[in-house]
Amino acid sequence: MKKVVVGMSGGVDSSVAAYLLKEAGYDVIGVTMQIWQDEDNQTVEENGGCCGLSAVDDARRVANSLDIPYYVMNFKSEFKANVMDYFVKEYQAGRTPNPCIACNRYVKWESLLTRSLQIGADYIATGHYARIVTLPNGRFALKKSATAAKDQTYALYNLTQDQLSKTLMPVGEYTKEEVREIAAKIGLLVANKPDSQEICFVPDNNYAGFIEDYTGQKIIPGNFVDTKGNILGRHQGIIHYTVGQRKGLGIALGRPAFVVEIRPETNEVVIGSNDDIFTDRLIANKLNAMAVEEFEDGMEVIAKIRYNHEGSKCTIRKVSDTEIACEFETPQRAVTPGQAVVFYQGDIVVGGGTIIK
């Protein structure tokens, strides 16, 4: 009997994943990853975070009802190094990070998989809405989930071949409604539990306040400038802004104004028109080729430049051994440094990288 460690967040998706795997004949072990929590745990509890005490309690109750072993594992140091430190450094560098992607690759997979193999597991499993397939070329790849609205492949694009070969994602074949129906049918107390907060360690979405508290440093204001370098006014610190932003700029120009660029080296935020935030080309690094050995020059794909982006046709161009360009058929709005660009062919994830410009 194959042994699988299921990462259980206390939510309905991972709970049903554990149930489905047990029904399929696996030897299932439930594990909740303790990654971060408030000093008083209060804001995590109020915002339904995946790492508060109530999440552990819910996961433990589900494991008991499924009659599977259950453990809590401490990954706080791994989470701090790979997610929180990265999050802060990216904002300080004028980029807009995606901490969930970093958490998936380096904590939920790299760290959990290593520890699971040490206790004799063959696989790890999660409640993500994605599917894993083996392609004719022998490579493992992600395939979009059965329900497009819940598909989570964008946030999983940088998983390695080794990680994919040892991962199961049983709820990828189901819709969210079907998952809740299964949970209700077998009497799980989390059947109607709301989805968890996306960024668990900034539950109030006050990134600036979090970064000031985390670093112990005050954020330094600077200048708003136009695309020609003329000073337009003062901003409250570059971490408050992201490319494409219009609301909350705190500057009145008598016309619609958008963030075009963030310049950390001069502490400037460039403001322009809506036309200024469209581009037909981006450069990406930190590449992960998934469905192919490497990205080929001239490869045609659909590229997603943010989680809720529908995707747009583009052609991949090799820039160097570590960078590629993506040339779009139609200009794209607010291509944001720090975010992921993920490439698809049909429902298959080809791979992706991090946007640098």
Curated annotation (Swiss-Prot):
Pfam families: tRNA_Me_trans, tRNA_Me_trans_C, tRNA_Me_trans_M. It is found in: Cytoplasm. Disulfide bonds join 103-200. It comes from the Bacteria. One of its GO terms (molecular function) is tRNA binding. Keywords: ATP-binding, Cytoplasm, Disulfide bond, Nucleotide-binding, RNA-binding, Transferase, tRNA processing, tRNA-binding. Its main location: cytoplasm. The active site is at 103 (nucleophile), 200 (cysteine persulfide intermediate). The keyword Electron transport does not apply. One of its GO terms (cellular component) is cytoplasm. Its EC number is 2.8.1.13. GO terms for biological process: tRNA wobble position uridine thiolation. ATP binds at residues 7-14, 33, 127. Coiled coil: none annotated. Belongs to the MnmA/TRMU family. Catalyzes the 2-thiolation of uridine at the wobble position (U34) of tRNA, leading to the formation of s(2)U34. This is tRNA-specific 2-thiouridylase MnmA.
